[in-house]
């Protein structure tokens, strides 16, 4: 990260938890997240909110505004705040 600048990155794929087998397409490994060199990594592909932050990198699957598959109308999104005093924070917002 560069002082006085926010580095935000986007990635699309499956986060690889320790218990996962290497059978998913587009794996994102924990060390790749930790080494991303950004303040916030916005992740996509999953339709639910999951925080997979590693090291100093905040990494979050945002959820889906339409709701998870099979649960239409129960959506949520992630609102991210980048504050020079407090760093990266986020909150989930329900979409009705």
Question: Can you say where each PLM-predicted feature lies in the sequence?
Answer:
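C-terminal functional module detector
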Residues: 69-96
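His/Asp/Glu-rich metal-coordinating catalytic cores
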Residues: 1-59, 64-69, 74, 81
